[in-house]
């Protein structure tokens, strides 16, 4: 038996589908966490897709990014998530479940994360129910 055929219990085997899913969620987190840089806008503009729903959405997103400059994209991000006083959308799960920020759903999420050994990353100021954190 080859060494490659034997896996220790500490090594996880991740399917290609799960790896691609993780990459997609990481990309979404990048888009939702902060105002996108010019490099991120370029990365979005370079996306390509296939005939699947996600592929079609990727192609549409790329097409839109090709038509916009970085400043316009950042302004849209600010309008959506920051705004004057408040953005058009609040990127926090608690708000959509209870109508308030930092409510029981956030406390439950923190308990669930602690139970499986996940903690908020050092330096992250947003609460764990921020959409970018959930995508991470």
Report the location of each language-model feature:
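Surface/interface-facing alpha-helical segments and adjacent flexible terminal/loop regions used
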Residues: 1-136
